UniProtKB/Swiss-Prot annotation:
This is Nuclear distribution protein nudE-like 1. Residues 56-166 are annotated as: Self-association. A lipid is attached at C273 (S-palmitoyl cysteine). InterPro entries: NUDE, NUDE_dom. GO terms for molecular function: microtubule binding. GO terms for cellular component: centrosome; cytoplasm; kinesin complex; kinetochore; microtubule; spindle. Phosphorylated in mitosis. Can be phosphorylated by CDK1, CDK5 and MAPK1. Phosphorylation by CDK5 promotes interaction with KATNA1 and YWHAE. Expressed at low levels in heart, hypothalamus, liver, lung, spleen and stomach. Expressed at higher levels in testis and brain. Within the brain, expressed in cerebellum, cerebral stem, cortex and striatum. Residues 227-278 are annotated as: Interaction with DISC1. Signal peptide: none annotated.
Length: 345
Protein backbone atom coordinates (compact mmCIF):
# COMPACT_ATOMS: atom_id res chain seq x y z
CA UNK A 1 0.00 0.00 0.00
CA UNK A 2 2.92 2.27 0.69
CA UNK A 3 4.14 1.59 -2.75
CA UNK A 4 0.88 2.38 -4.35
CA UNK A 5 0.19 5.92 -5.28
CA UNK A 6 -2.77 7.35 -3.61
CA UNK A 7 -4.70 9.27 -6.14
CA UNK A 8 -5.94 12.72 -5.50
CA UNK A 9 -9.53 12.88 -4.61
CA UNK A 10 -11.74 15.71 -5.66
CA UNK A 11 -14.32 14.91 -3.13
CA UNK A 12 -14.83 12.91 -0.05
CA UNK A 13 -17.29 10.63 -1.76
CA UNK A 14 -14.76 9.62 -4.29
CA UNK A 15 -12.27 9.04 -1.54
CA UNK A 16 -14.79 6.98 0.40
CA UNK A 17 -15.76 5.00 -2.64
CA UNK A 18 -12.14 4.38 -3.35
CA UNK A 19 -11.37 3.15 0.12
CA UNK A 20 -14.47 0.98 0.20
CA UNK A 21 -13.56 -0.56 -3.05
CA UNK A 22 -10.01 -1.09 -1.78
CA UNK A 23 -11.25 -2.58 1.47
CA UNK A 24 -13.55 -4.91 -0.37
CA UNK A 25 -10.69 -5.95 -2.53
CA UNK A 26 -8.46 -6.64 0.44
CA UNK A 27 -11.27 -8.37 2.22
CA UNK A 28 -11.81 -10.63 -0.74
CA UNK A 29 -8.07 -11.27 -0.94
CA UNK A 30 -8.06 -12.00 2.80
CA UNK A 31 -10.99 -14.31 2.42
CA UNK A 32 -9.28 -16.13 -0.43
CA UNK A 33 -6.07 -16.32 1.59
CA UNK A 34 -7.96 -17.66 4.60
CA UNK A 35 -9.70 -20.23 2.44
CA UNK A 36 -6.39 -21.20 0.96
CA UNK A 37 -4.94 -21.39 4.50
CA UNK A 38 -7.75 -23.60 5.68
CA UNK A 39 -7.41 -25.71 2.61
CA UNK A 40 -3.65 -25.78 3.10
CA UNK A 41 -4.04 -26.75 6.73
CA UNK A 42 -6.43 -29.51 5.82
CA UNK A 43 -4.08 -30.67 3.13
CA UNK A 44 -1.18 -30.38 5.56
CA UNK A 45 -3.03 -32.47 8.14
CA UNK A 46 -3.90 -35.05 5.54
CA UNK A 47 -0.36 -34.99 4.28
CA UNK A 48 0.97 -35.22 7.83
CA UNK A 49 -1.30 -38.15 8.58
CA UNK A 50 -0.31 -39.77 5.37
CA UNK A 51 3.36 -39.08 6.06
CA UNK A 52 2.99 -40.41 9.58
CA UNK A 53 1.38 -43.53 8.21
CA UNK A 54 4.13 -43.82 5.65
CA UNK A 55 6.66 -43.19 8.41
CA UNK A 56 5.12 -45.92 10.51
CA UNK A 57 5.16 -48.19 7.52
CA UNK A 58 8.72 -47.19 6.73
CA UNK A 59 9.77 -47.76 10.33
CA UNK A 60 8.03 -51.14 10.33
CA UNK A 61 9.59 -51.95 7.05
CA UNK A 62 12.93 -50.76 8.37
CA UNK A 63 12.57 -53.00 11.40
CA UNK A 64 11.62 -55.89 9.16
CA UNK A 65 14.54 -55.13 6.91
CA UNK A 66 16.85 -54.90 9.88
CA UNK A 67 15.53 -58.23 11.14
CA UNK A 68 15.96 -59.68 7.68
CA UNK A 69 19.40 -58.15 7.50
CA UNK A 70 20.35 -59.63 10.83
CA UNK A 71 18.93 -62.99 9.80
CA UNK A 72 20.77 -62.79 6.52
CA UNK A 73 23.95 -61.89 8.36
CA UNK A 74 23.50 -64.98 10.52
CA UNK A 75 22.80 -67.02 7.42
CA UNK A 76 25.85 -65.54 5.72
CA UNK A 77 27.98 -66.42 8.72
CA UNK A 78 26.53 -69.91 8.77
CA UNK A 79 27.06 -70.25 5.04
CA UNK A 80 30.61 -68.99 5.41
CA UNK A 81 31.29 -71.55 8.11
CA UNK A 82 29.60 -74.24 6.03
CA UNK A 83 31.52 -73.15 2.96
CA UNK A 84 34.78 -73.23 4.86
CA UNK A 85 33.89 -76.66 6.21
CA UNK A 86 32.93 -77.86 2.73
CA UNK A 87 36.09 -76.36 1.31
CA UNK A 88 38.19 -78.14 3.95
CA UNK A 89 36.37 -81.40 3.26
CA UNK A 90 36.70 -80.90 -0.48
CA UNK A 91 40.40 -80.19 -0.08
CA UNK A 92 40.80 -83.34 1.97
CA UNK A 93 38.79 -85.34 -0.55
CA UNK A 94 40.80 -83.88 -3.42
CA UNK A 95 44.02 -84.76 -1.59
CA UNK A 96 42.77 -88.28 -0.93
CA UNK A 97 41.59 -88.64 -4.53
CA UNK A 98 44.93 -87.37 -5.82
CA UNK A 99 46.71 -89.91 -3.63
CA UNK A 100 44.32 -92.62 -4.85
CA UNK A 101 44.89 -91.49 -8.42
CA UNK A 102 48.65 -91.66 -8.04
CA UNK A 103 48.35 -95.09 -6.39
CA UNK A 104 45.95 -96.22 -9.13
CA UNK A 105 48.35 -95.03 -11.79
CA UNK A 106 51.20 -96.85 -10.08
CA UNK A 107 49.05 -99.99 -9.82
CA UNK A 108 48.09 -99.57 -13.48
CA UNK A 109 51.74 -99.36 -14.48
CA UNK A 110 52.51 -102.42 -12.36
CA UNK A 111 49.59 -104.27 -13.95
CA UNK A 112 50.82 -103.28 -17.42
CA UNK A 113 54.27 -104.59 -16.53
CA UNK A 114 52.72 -107.74 -15.05
CA UNK A 115 50.61 -108.24 -18.19
CA UNK A 116 53.69 -107.83 -20.38
CA UNK A 117 55.58 -110.30 -18.19
CA UNK A 118 52.64 -112.71 -18.38
CA UNK A 119 52.53 -112.34 -22.16
CA UNK A 120 56.26 -112.99 -22.36
CA UNK A 121 55.90 -115.96 -20.00
CA UNK A 122 52.97 -117.20 -22.08
CA UNK A 123 55.05 -116.93 -25.24
CA UNK A 124 57.91 -118.75 -23.51
CA UNK A 125 55.51 -121.43 -22.30
CA UNK A 126 54.03 -121.80 -25.77
CA UNK A 127 57.50 -122.15 -27.25
CA UNK A 128 58.39 -124.64 -24.52
CA UNK A 129 55.12 -126.47 -25.20
CA UNK A 130 55.87 -126.65 -28.91
CA UNK A 131 59.41 -127.82 -28.17
CA UNK A 132 58.05 -130.38 -25.70
CA UNK A 133 55.50 -131.59 -28.25
CA UNK A 134 58.23 -131.92 -30.86
CA UNK A 135 60.45 -133.72 -28.33
CA UNK A 136 57.59 -136.01 -27.34
CA UNK A 137 56.79 -136.75 -30.98
CA UNK A 138 60.46 -137.51 -31.59
CA UNK A 139 60.54 -139.64 -28.46
CA UNK A 140 57.35 -141.47 -29.48
CA UNK A 141 58.78 -142.08 -32.94
CA UNK A 142 61.99 -143.44 -31.48
CA UNK A 143 60.00 -145.45 -28.95
CA UNK A 144 57.90 -146.96 -31.73
CA UNK A 145 61.06 -147.75 -33.65
CA UNK A 146 62.54 -149.28 -30.51
CA UNK A 147 59.38 -151.33 -29.98
CA UNK A 148 59.54 -152.49 -33.58
CA UNK A 149 63.21 -153.28 -33.16
CA UNK A 150 62.49 -155.18 -29.94
CA UNK A 151 59.78 -157.13 -31.75
CA UNK A 152 62.28 -157.98 -34.47
CA UNK A 153 64.83 -158.94 -31.82
CA UNK A 154 62.29 -161.13 -30.06
CA UNK A 155 61.53 -162.86 -33.33
CA UNK A 156 65.25 -163.28 -33.87
CA UNK A 157 65.62 -164.64 -30.34
CA UNK A 158 62.99 -167.21 -31.16
CA UNK A 159 64.87 -167.95 -34.35
CA UNK A 160 68.07 -168.18 -32.33
CA UNK A 161 66.50 -170.77 -30.07
CA UNK A 162 65.43 -172.79 -33.07
CA UNK A 163 68.89 -172.31 -34.57
CA UNK A 164 70.48 -173.46 -31.31
CA UNK A 165 68.40 -176.60 -31.49
CA UNK A 166 69.47 -177.05 -35.10
CA UNK A 167 73.10 -176.37 -34.15
CA UNK A 168 72.97 -178.95 -31.40
CA UNK A 169 71.45 -181.44 -33.79
CA UNK A 170 74.07 -180.60 -36.42
CA UNK A 171 76.82 -180.91 -33.81
CA UNK A 172 75.58 -184.35 -33.01
CA UNK A 173 75.48 -185.15 -36.71
CA UNK A 174 78.98 -183.67 -37.15
CA UNK A 175 80.25 -185.81 -34.29
CA UNK A 176 78.69 -188.84 -35.93
CA UNK A 177 80.20 -187.73 -39.24
CA UNK A 178 83.64 -187.40 -37.66
CA UNK A 179 83.34 -190.84 -36.14
CA UNK A 180 82.22 -192.26 -39.46
CA UNK A 181 85.00 -190.32 -41.19
CA UNK A 182 87.54 -191.83 -38.82
CA UNK A 183 86.17 -195.29 -39.60
CA UNK A 184 86.28 -194.53 -43.31
CA UNK A 185 89.86 -193.29 -43.03
CA UNK A 186 90.87 -196.49 -41.33
CA UNK A 187 89.07 -198.45 -44.03
CA UNK A 188 90.76 -196.31 -46.72
CA UNK A 189 94.16 -196.92 -45.13
CA UNK A 190 93.46 -200.62 -45.32
CA UNK A 191 92.26 -200.46 -48.93
CA UNK A 192 95.06 -198.06 -49.94
CA UNK A 193 97.65 -200.70 -49.23
CA UNK A 194 95.94 -203.22 -51.49
CA UNK A 195 94.61 -200.81 -54.21
CA UNK A 196 96.60 -199.65 -57.33
CA UNK A 197 98.24 -196.24 -57.65
CA UNK A 198 95.39 -194.41 -59.42
CA UNK A 199 92.83 -195.11 -56.70
CA UNK A 200 95.43 -193.95 -54.20
CA UNK A 201 95.51 -190.55 -55.85
CA UNK A 202 91.72 -190.34 -55.71
CA UNK A 203 91.75 -191.22 -52.04
CA UNK A 204 94.37 -188.57 -51.36
CA UNK A 205 92.23 -185.96 -53.07
CA UNK A 206 89.25 -187.05 -51.00
CA UNK A 207 91.31 -186.89 -47.81
CA UNK A 208 92.45 -183.35 -48.61
CA UNK A 209 88.83 -182.31 -49.19
CA UNK A 210 87.77 -183.89 -45.92
CA UNK A 211 90.61 -182.19 -44.04
CA UNK A 212 89.62 -178.85 -45.58
CA UNK A 213 86.04 -179.42 -44.48
CA UNK A 214 87.17 -180.26 -40.96
CA UNK A 215 89.00 -176.94 -40.71
CA UNK A 216 85.60 -175.12 -41.19
CA UNK A 217 86.51 -172.74 -44.01
CA UNK A 218 84.53 -169.53 -44.46
CA UNK A 219 82.30 -170.57 -47.35
CA UNK A 220 79.74 -168.16 -48.87
CA UNK A 221 76.39 -168.12 -47.15
CA UNK A 222 74.58 -168.74 -50.39
CA UNK A 223 76.24 -172.13 -50.82
CA UNK A 224 75.38 -173.07 -47.28
CA UNK A 225 71.76 -172.19 -47.79
CA UNK A 226 71.62 -173.95 -51.14
CA UNK A 227 73.08 -177.14 -49.66
CA UNK A 228 71.42 -176.80 -46.26
CA UNK A 229 68.64 -179.18 -47.27
CA UNK A 230 70.19 -182.04 -49.26
CA UNK A 231 68.29 -185.11 -50.19
CA UNK A 232 67.46 -187.55 -47.42
CA UNK A 233 69.36 -190.27 -49.28
CA UNK A 234 72.67 -188.45 -48.78
CA UNK A 235 72.26 -187.45 -45.08
CA UNK A 236 72.32 -190.15 -42.42
CA UNK A 237 70.06 -189.84 -39.40
CA UNK A 238 72.57 -191.29 -37.01
CA UNK A 239 70.87 -194.67 -37.01
CA UNK A 240 70.89 -195.66 -40.68
CA UNK A 241 73.58 -197.47 -42.55
CA UNK A 242 73.57 -195.46 -45.83
CA UNK A 243 76.88 -193.65 -46.18
CA UNK A 244 77.30 -189.90 -46.91
CA UNK A 245 78.99 -188.67 -50.02
CA UNK A 246 82.03 -186.38 -49.56
CA UNK A 247 80.15 -183.35 -50.95
CA UNK A 248 77.33 -183.96 -48.44
CA UNK A 249 79.82 -184.15 -45.58
CA UNK A 250 81.47 -180.89 -46.69
CA UNK A 251 78.07 -179.18 -46.99
CA UNK A 252 77.06 -180.38 -43.51
CA UNK A 253 80.29 -179.06 -42.01
CA UNK A 254 79.83 -175.76 -43.84
CA UNK A 255 76.31 -175.52 -42.45
CA UNK A 256 77.64 -176.09 -38.93
CA UNK A 257 80.24 -173.35 -39.41
CA UNK A 258 77.64 -170.93 -40.75
CA UNK A 259 75.32 -171.68 -37.86
CA UNK A 260 78.12 -171.06 -35.39
CA UNK A 261 78.81 -167.71 -37.01
CA UNK A 262 75.10 -166.89 -36.84
CA UNK A 263 75.04 -167.74 -33.15
CA UNK A 264 78.00 -165.41 -32.58
CA UNK A 265 76.23 -162.64 -34.49
CA UNK A 266 73.08 -163.15 -32.42
CA UNK A 267 75.08 -162.96 -29.20
CA UNK A 268 76.60 -159.70 -30.42
CA UNK A 269 73.10 -158.40 -31.16
CA UNK A 270 71.94 -159.40 -27.70
CA UNK A 271 74.82 -157.43 -26.20
CA UNK A 272 73.87 -154.45 -28.38
CA UNK A 273 70.24 -154.82 -27.25
CA UNK A 274 71.30 -154.74 -23.60
CA UNK A 275 73.35 -151.61 -24.26
CA UNK A 276 70.36 -150.12 -26.05
CA UNK A 277 68.08 -150.82 -23.05
CA UNK A 278 70.55 -149.10 -20.72
CA UNK A 279 70.92 -146.16 -23.10
CA UNK A 280 67.13 -145.94 -23.46
CA UNK A 281 66.62 -145.73 -19.69
CA UNK A 282 69.29 -143.03 -19.31
CA UNK A 283 67.95 -141.12 -22.33
CA UNK A 284 64.40 -141.24 -20.95
CA UNK A 285 65.53 -139.74 -17.62
CA UNK A 286 67.60 -137.16 -19.52
CA UNK A 287 64.65 -136.17 -21.75
CA UNK A 288 62.26 -135.87 -18.77
CA UNK A 289 64.80 -133.71 -16.93
CA UNK A 290 65.32 -131.49 -19.98
CA UNK A 291 61.56 -131.11 -20.54
CA UNK A 292 60.98 -130.11 -16.91
CA UNK A 293 63.87 -127.65 -17.00
CA UNK A 294 62.61 -126.18 -20.28
CA UNK A 295 59.09 -125.61 -18.87
CA UNK A 296 60.30 -124.11 -15.55
CA UNK A 297 62.91 -121.85 -17.11
CA UNK A 298 60.62 -120.92 -20.08
CA UNK A 299 63.55 -120.99 -22.41
CA UNK A 300 61.57 -122.92 -25.04
CA UNK A 301 64.73 -124.33 -26.62
CA UNK A 302 64.77 -127.84 -27.96
CA UNK A 303 67.51 -129.98 -26.56
CA UNK A 304 70.15 -130.75 -29.15
CA UNK A 305 70.85 -134.26 -30.12
CA UNK A 306 74.41 -133.43 -31.15
CA UNK A 307 77.03 -134.85 -28.82
CA UNK A 308 74.80 -137.82 -27.88
CA UNK A 309 75.08 -141.15 -29.59
CA UNK A 310 71.76 -142.31 -30.95
CA UNK A 311 70.56 -145.68 -29.78
CA UNK A 312 70.32 -146.69 -33.43
CA UNK A 313 74.10 -146.25 -33.77
CA UNK A 314 74.89 -148.45 -30.78
CA UNK A 315 75.94 -151.29 -33.04
CA UNK A 316 78.61 -149.13 -34.68
CA UNK A 317 79.72 -147.74 -31.30
CA UNK A 318 80.07 -151.20 -29.82
CA UNK A 319 82.11 -152.31 -32.84
CA UNK A 320 79.35 -154.54 -34.18
CA UNK A 321 79.05 -154.42 -37.95
CA UNK A 322 76.50 -157.05 -38.98
CA UNK A 323 76.94 -158.81 -42.30
CA UNK A 324 74.39 -158.30 -45.07
CA UNK A 325 71.62 -160.90 -45.20
CA UNK A 326 72.18 -163.91 -47.46
CA UNK A 327 70.00 -164.13 -50.54
CA UNK A 328 68.30 -167.29 -49.32
CA UNK A 329 67.36 -166.07 -45.82
CA UNK A 330 67.00 -162.29 -45.99
CA UNK A 331 64.68 -162.03 -49.00
CA UNK A 332 61.47 -162.76 -47.05
CA UNK A 333 62.19 -160.39 -44.11
CA UNK A 334 60.74 -156.85 -43.92
CA UNK A 335 63.16 -153.99 -44.28
CA UNK A 336 64.23 -152.40 -41.01
CA UNK A 337 63.78 -148.72 -40.29
CA UNK A 338 66.62 -146.32 -41.21
CA UNK A 339 69.34 -146.19 -38.60
CA UNK A 340 68.39 -149.54 -37.05
CA UNK A 341 70.63 -152.58 -37.00
CA UNK A 342 69.87 -155.19 -39.66
CA UNK A 343 68.01 -158.02 -38.00
CA UNK A 344 68.87 -160.79 -40.45
CA UNK A 345 71.92 -162.94 -39.76
Amino acid sequence: MDGEDIPDFSSLKEETAYWKELSLKYKQTFQEARDELVEFQEGSRELEAELEAQLVQAEQRNRDLQADNQRLKYEVEALKEKLEHQYAQSYKQVSVLEDDLSQTRAIKEQLHKYVRELEQANDDLERAKRATIVSLEDFEQRLNQAIERNAFLESELDEKESLLVSVQRLKDEARDLRQELAVRERQQEVTRKSAPSSPTLDCEKMDSAVQASLSLPATPVGKGTENSFPSPKAIPNGFGTSPLTPSARISALNIVGDLLRKVGALESKLAACRNFAKDQASRKSYISGNVNCGVMNSNGTKFSRSGHTSFFDKGAVNGFDPAPPPPGLGSSRPLSAPGMLPLSV
